[in-house]
């Protein structure tokens, strides 16, 4: 949960979706890992964590699921977010960084794929609009957000994780560990 978890918590926390309680399902599949010296060392980290949370949005309790998975077949450092309402939803994944999926309830339930390219980035990127954006462009976005936030020029855009958000993630993960150990939901607020 630790190093991966903050990535999954950043957006919900920034939106004000703070978990009130959590029930955690933690998986420890590998007990050893390579030690970098040709041998094996004990592995004391959780491989996968699914945190079933409840948060308040507009005065109503709604479910919030935060998932971090070291073991995720066919994924390579993939991060995604999916926000679903009764009539609309949106989905984004770093696996398809130029694509946003939008759900709308019409006569049928429809997911539409929008190819937004990388021209909609908060800050200009090195790569031209007709080319595939890469790691250097993503890294540049992070540095630009840090610099803009530091100079007070970020405006309405998301900045870097705050110390308060880091503390909240640690509180959530501590409650998740207790939830797993006690096999019950743990209150946070």
Segment roles from a protein language model:
Residues 74, 81, 107-189:
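C-terminal helical cap and adjacent loop that interface with cofactors, partners, or active-site loops
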Residues 3-105, 138-153, 174-175, 188:
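Contiguous beta-strand/loop segments that form the cofactor/metal-binding neighborhood of enzyme cores
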């Amino acid at each position: 949960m630790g190093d991966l978890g903050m990535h999954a918590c950043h957006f919900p926390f920034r939106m004000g979706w703070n978990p009130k309680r959590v029930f955690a399902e933690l998986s420890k599949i590998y007990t050893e890992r390579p030690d970098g010296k040709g041998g094996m060392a004990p592995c004391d980290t959780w491989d996968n964590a699914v945190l079933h949370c409840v948060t308040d949005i507009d005065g109503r309790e709604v479910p919030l699921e935060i998932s971090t998975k070291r073991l995720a077949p066919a994924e390579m450092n993939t991060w995604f977010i999916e926000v679903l309402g009764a009539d609309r939803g949106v989905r984004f994944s770093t696996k398809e960084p130029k694509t946003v999926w939008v759900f709308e309830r019409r006569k049928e339930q429809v997911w539409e794929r929008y190819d937004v390219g990388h021209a909609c980035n908060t800050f200009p990127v090195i790569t031209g609009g007709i080319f595939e954006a890469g790691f250097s462009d993503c890294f540049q976005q992070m540095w630009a957000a840090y610099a803009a936030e530091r100079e007070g020029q970020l405006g309405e855009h998301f900045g870097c994780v705050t110390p308060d958000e880091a503390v909240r993630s640690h509180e959530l993960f501590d409650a998740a560990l207790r939830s797993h150990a006690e096999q019950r939901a743990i209150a946070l607020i």
